[in-house]
Amino acid sequence: SPNSESILQFGDPGTARDFLERESYVISYNRRDRVASWTGEHLTADSLKTGDGVDRDHSKFKEDPDVPSLFRSTLADYSGSGFDRGHMAPAGDAVATQPAMDQTFYLSNMSPQVGIGFNRHYWAYLEGFCRSLTKKFSDVYVFTGPLFLPTKGSDGKYTVTYNVLQGNVAVPTHFYKVILVPQGDNKYAYGAFILPNQAIDTKTPLTNFKVKLTDVEKASGLTFFDKLDVSTLGDLCAATTCAVSSSGGGDA
């Protein structure tokens, strides 16, 4: 409108995000929190076949040159923080080529995660569960991201409290995974999970963290699968066993 043209004649402040396309994933990076709002992947049995010479030991954590320097997360932000640089789109999902794997090590794809008991264990096993779904389903769509959830205090008031590494990188209180699989005849099933960013006993059933899609949407401000009639979506955990295993090929 003419009014908005006048107001924004010197510039539009923007959406505080960068949408970036990689070889094995897409990402919406949140410039304020310096973590991804979401990453999206399409996994298949073929996409998970390891290419010749692909080795995660050849990959190095690095700043994302596609994010303006003012808004980047840096190696210094994470150094000595006590938190792992946790992949949102896992390296273990990007095994087709070395560049694909290298791209998962951009810091834009990292969120600060508790290491022992979470990033290196339960969360890694959940990543393995997502990969294992390709044995049963032709296509597996996975969306992953951080959440900052409120807690209720003794005074009955809700607050959101989280660390910020070096005053730059927000440490999420929780993380979500939303998974979509086909069930034939243009039907689909989904699973949505919200996990706390803390050590989780390996024996804890994955279904303890199962939530409704709208729970993730309300907490994240995102909308998933708006090109589908979500009221018709089946339950992933009815279509297959939703469980994590320490032998499930997890990936930190």
Curated annotation (Swiss-Prot):
Main location: secreted
Source superkingdom: Eukaryota
InterPro entries: DNA/RNA_endonuclease_AS, DNA/RNA_non-sp_Endonuclease_sf, Endo_G_ENPP1-like_dom, ENPP1-3/EXOG-like_nuc-like, His-Me_finger_sf, Non-specific_endonuclease
Cofactor: Mg(2+); Mn(2+)
Residues in the signal sequence: none
Cellular-component GO terms for this entry: extracellular region; mitochondrial inner membrane; nucleus
Keywords: Endonuclease, Hydrolase, Magnesium, Manganese, Metal-binding, Nuclease, Secreted
The keyword Manganese is assigned to this record: yes
Protein EC: 3.1.30.-
Hydrolase in keyword set: yes
Protein name: Nuclease C1
Gene source species: Cunninghamella echinulata var. echinulata
Originating gene: NUC1CE
